Amino acid sequence: MAESKAKALQKELSYEYPHIAKVSPDQIEKAAEFANGYKNFLNKSKTEREVVKEVTSLLEANGYTVFDPKKSYKPGDKIYKVNRKKAVLASTIGTEPITEGIRINGAHIDSPRLDLRPNPMYEKSETAYFKTHYYGGIKKYQWATMPLSMHGVIFKKDGSFVELNVGENEEDPVFYISDLLPHLSKKQDKRTLEEGIKGEELNIFLGTLPFDDSDDIKDSVKLKTLEILNQMYGITERDFARAEIEFVPATKARDVGFDRSLLAGYGHDDRVCAYPAIIAEVEAKSPKYTTLTILADKEEIGSVGNTGLHSHFVYDYIEYLSQCFGADVKEVCEKSACLSSDVNAAFDPTFPDVYEPNNSAYLNKGCVLTKYTGARGKSGSSDASAEFMNKVISIMDEHNVHWQTGELGAIDAGGGGTIAQYVAMMNIDVVDLGVPVISMHSPYEVISKLDLYNTYLAFKAFYE
């Protein structure tokens, strides 16, 4: 039976983003395989320092050398630069002159967490604790009553340092923040959800045993804990002032659901974009345009500091790279193009009120192209031009990448920002593209494997 004129016209003029499994079922197995590599990366890389260490090993194993602005480079050469052990840049030299611009892919590798305070240790009621200061936008109540692991670095008086990683191995102890039992939480229950657990209540259990022969001293449990730390690492209490220690969920990335189509883990924001970005970088053997993959720090607190995109370290790198070819950095930036590789909120059917269904990203419909982020009247957004949207969409369509558009929730429901605005400050065209995430900024976020895989395909196409 022939299609009605209305149906034929609707098919020609209307469009809905399809479920990938319905139109490209062959991608299910490919996505699962790609996700296995990502799971391994996620489990090894719980902090920005650990990501840099893991990525540096990957780059060196694939022939990358440390960038030297005094050297000359030719097409196909692979170089990288580490910024203070907390951010990394990687490039493959393209066949086109650098004056034609470079292709940039920028993700961030910091995630919401609990940081140790400079003077963190105390004892109360014969229990030793650490005081923490939360990093990034978290729901504080989500961090209580769950296993935590400790990661970081402590410098000692003699200038040496020790790296910490406690709570990830099965035989390790974990750390813990308490909450009230419901039988005694009548007063606490009247708090707002935001204040259910307060920042000053994010205190981590360390120990409860006193130091031997300690009847005549104060804080004997704290002393016992300090003795253990001194025996393990050779540190004293004063050394915490020259430390960077982070507490993160002591969990592993796991498949979700009977069909294993989803993946839960800590740090999807934004390592779910950082991983496919660096894989696409490594696989770019002979790109037309020189590539620049950015894995930056500090995005969760505004891209501040000298390892965040608000600093000049990326611009300086582009300038030095331009000088290697006798080019003007301003000319290079003006002709360059960038994907700000960051996640967006996936539509959550349990909480539909904060989304506008026609302009939301959905699981299993591909990477999400976000024209603008920000809050209220697009405040804090870059807002990509129609010309650049067309350029990026054309690349993805040409390479059969599944993509969708989406905003960060309904108007005035909240908002957020990415590194796009700081890339735009360098006079570079930029748009956000990444993976939709359920329960973003929680200790255990969820993504779709098919969306992850198509984000990788988008990055690969962008570099090719």
Language model regions located:
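N-terminal hydrophobic/helix-forming segments and targeting peptides
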Residues: 1-464
